Amino acid sequence: MDPKYIRNFSIVAHIDHGKSTLADRMLEATGAVQKREMRAQLLDDMELERERGITIKARAVTIHHKFDGHEYQLNLIDTPGHVDFNYEVEKSMQACEGAVLLVDSSQGVEAQTVANAYLAIEADLEIIPVLNKTDLPHSRPEEVSEEIENSLALEATDAIRISAKTGENVDQVLDRIVERVPAPGGDPDGTLRALIFDAVYDEYRGVIVYLRVVDGSINKRDRVRMLGTGKVYETIELGRFQPKMLPSDGLRAGEVGYFVSNIKQLGDVRVGDTIVLDKGPEAEMLPGYKEPQHMVFADFYPTNPGDYQGMRDALETLCLSDSSLAFEPVSSDALGFGYRCGFLGLLHMEIIEQRLEREHDMDMIQTAPSVTYQILMKDGTEGWIHSPGALPSPDQYEELREPIARVSMLLPTEYIGPVLQISTDHRGNFVRQEHLSPTRCLLYTSPSPRDRQKSRMPSSA
């Protein structure tokens, strides 16, 4: 397809604002799924996602929409809403030119609305504000539009008002995507360059690589090379997501799809790597991704010592589909051999634990979660401490620095006093306050001056 008729976009929002429901309605409206096959959260195929009603893993799907006499190919990436899975959102945005910013018109702008909007702005995406749940009696679209403008500096007076539950005005969202999201750049006739934005492991087919073709084209039986690892593979199967994997003969510049090459070694695929033709002209590597910053650490020990290697295999498999997970071997006098794992947050840790138990039948003991500390030694060197047992004696180091966070809090005005008190009790320092609407405000806090002097670690918002 001509790239000028392709649009790549994601849906971003705070948790429970209706992302997956809107994706369902888009699939229905474009005829991508037959009514008899339709079910809620169609793209959320992980058991834990359907059980909890949340999106954990980003999903891609290709749909077709007619506008102004032309048929457009829309590549949709449905992303998670919880802060612990922000890395999934960030990866997905690298494969897009636009983002639908979905806001619950009864709840208004919330924490992940702001965080995901900032990610979209940093990725230079065209942002389309959409107000959901306008069919509810307590919906307040005018106020929420004002909140979007005040907190994010985005024009929202013409934000589309929809009900993802009933499908009202979803067709207008599709039209707006075609109108405002730019067509993908790149050279359709140039040398192949494709970005790996995700990968999953299939027991029978091996690693399935998700890619966005930036330049050129990739065809079945092509021999391709990954610039980061230098590995060469033959594309045995490639295709698009509609929403199930549908094989095709090739993918062109601007398209999103997958390929299979009997890749069995999990470490051979790196999210953010660039794919080129093996015998083609030299190509420059595409910008990759920032390494995820692990905020929480915990140790996992198999209850049966014989399962040590099995736990390693399970963690390696999870690492392929979740590149924000990290682990390393660890030992304990009481618990034996296990693995110390790094997570983006407590929910991320809980999800990984449950996936190990359900998908890999692991019976294990988990230690209490902890954070990483930075240590300044007497000789001037710096290091990282992941557990109390790794802390040297006090006469060997000058400073022990704990993580800090600069926090923005969106809340109803009646809770300002109690929230400030809790913040102060936890060593927070009030910075400033902004009123987004008559009923909602934005508070900024940071660590107290004493803590800022103690620590020079990077902050997180």
Model-derived regions, located:
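Structural and coupling elements of P-loop NTPases
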Residues: 1-446, 450-452
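Positively charged, low-complexity/disordered segments
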Residues: 449-451, 455-461
